[in-house]
Design a protein with these regions (language model features):
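N-terminal beta-strand motif that seeds the catalytic metal site of vicinal oxygen chelate
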Residues: 1-16, 60, 114-140, 151, ...
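Core segments of cupin and vicinal oxygen chelate
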Residues: 6-45, 130-170
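Short glycine-enriched loop/turn motifs at secondary-structure junctions
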Residues: 1, 53-56, 95, 123-125, ...
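Vicinal oxygen chelate
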Residues: 78-125, 153, 163, 203-242
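Generic non-transmembrane alpha-helical segments
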Residues: 21-26, 73-80, 145-150, 200-204
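Conserved active-site tyrosine of GNAT-family acetyltransferases
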Residues: 15-19, 77, 108, 139-143, ...
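Long, continuous compositionally biased terminal/linker segments
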Residues: 32, 38-80, 162-203
Length: 242
């Protein structure tokens, strides 16, 4: 579903150690590590800095091949000194066969290993995100506008939570103290979609976070545009032109 999800961290080395430690248990390998931007497929982190504050209150779920892998993810993390955010076990409120274990990363974001029988991610690393928001209805309207450009659709709706899904991944917006400073990117295969996304969202009154254009700093042909959601998180549509 995601082209990439990037968090900003207060201590890049410490956060990288955390994700290296726990993702290795899930057989998720680092796919890129240059320019101080480590990536594990569609999950990445970068150092916070002036005008680029730390990501807070995000929940990310990573796929585990078995319940035993969930148990090991949690045990290895706790043994390494990281804080538990919920012991491994069934979570029937999320699904009949849902089994998860939860840790907190060095900045207090929640990282989960999850196993459920009906599917396992095979096209990326992030299984799901939970993004807390001030106003569920306002955030839902924003992501409904983004959906046709990002290749996802709404799958669940309630006053307290809305879920959007595409392929085998999903993200939810839910009521709570807002998640801050996360970056979500969704891929398209033509520059015109990037242009139309940016025009549609800014004309609807959402804040520009970067106009359509090439970003060769990432790689030749990278063409993206950025808009801020109602809580200030950056949402991008990108065409890699590869």
């Amino acid at each position: 579903m995601f082209d990439h999800v990037t968090i900003r961290v207060s201590d890049r080395a410490a956060s990288q150690r955390f994700y290296d430690t726990v993702l290795a248990v899930l057989d998720i390998e680092k796919t890129y590590e240059e320019d101080e931007l480590p990536e594990w497929d569609d999950w990445s982190l970068t150092a916070a800095g002036d005008g680029k504050p730390v990501t807070r209150r995000l929940h990310v779920g990573f796929p585990a091949a078995s319940r035993a892998k969930v148990d090991e993810f949690w045990r290895i993390g706790v043994d390494a000194g990281y804080r538990s955010d919920g012991e491994p076990g069934p979570r029937p409120e999320y699904g009949d066969d849902y089994y998860g274990g939860f840790l907190l990363d060095p900045d207090g974001n929640s990282a989960e290993a999850v196993h459920y029988a009906e599917k396992l991610r095979d096209d990326g690393t992030v299984d799901h995100l939970w993004i807390r928001v001030r106003d569920v209805a306002a955030s839902k309207r924003f992501y409904e506008l983004v959906a046709p450009f990002g290749g996802f659709e709404q799958r669940f709706d309630s006053p307290e939570r809305a879920m959007f899904a595409g392929g085998t991944g999903s993200f939810s917006v839910l009521s709570g103290e807002p998640t801050e400073n996360v970056h979500l990117a969704f891929a398209t295969d033509d520059n015109a979609t990037v242009d139309t996304f940016h025009a549609a969202l800014t004309e609807a009154g959402y804040r520009d976070d970067g106009p359509p254009g090439e970003r060769p700093i990432y790689h030749p042909g990278y063409y993206g545009a950025y808009v801020l959601d109602p809580d200030g998180n950056s949402v991008e549509i990108v065409n890699h032109n590869r």
